[in-house]
UniProtKB/Swiss-Prot annotation:
Keywords: Ribonucleoprotein, Ribosomal protein. CDD domains: Ribosomal_L16_L10e. The keyword Ribosomal protein applies. PROSITE patterns: RIBOSOMAL_L10E. This is Large ribosomal subunit protein uL16. GO terms for cellular component: ribonucleoprotein complex; ribosome. InterPro entries: Ribosomal_uL16, Ribosomal_uL16_arc, Ribosomal_uL16_CS_euk_arc, Ribosomal_uL16_dom, Ribosomal_uL16_euk_arch, Ribosomal_uL16_sf.
Amino acid sequence: MARKPARMWRRLERPYTRTEYIDGAPGTRVRMFDMGNKSADFPVMLTLVAKEAVQIRENALEAARVVANKYVSRRAGASNYKLKLRIFPHHILREHKMAVGAGADRISQGMRAAFGKPVGRAARVKPGTKIMSVWVKPEHFEIAKEALRRAAMKMPTPTKIVVEKGHELLKGKI
């Protein structure tokens, strides 16, 4: 069965995270949360910040992580950056599957036992939540900024890119 559109789960409602009570809760699709040169210390830090309260599906998080990591590693080099995904998809999404097509009315139970089955995960985000951060050297500032801009395109919320560390090193670039 095809994936439902993300707009079905975008709005924040009540959280549903207790996996010990949920049979068949799916694992997360996000493969890595820390990428690049994890041990080095970089002077400039940029962060992608959410502007609205939404649920971000794990598919969108993984797509944003992949596109940002690929862009920075190819342009700046594998040892010249550190990238961290700062949110985790704890919230479990449920779907009440409905039968469609000819004869569906004979098979369907309607809204009886309509709680739904787990189909995926999402991260719950409030305004001002840091989604993703990149640490780089001052000469790779523009590359990191473009990587976060590309990652923002995968998000279901408006975002902003904030320079959290290294303002003094970026005179004329900000």
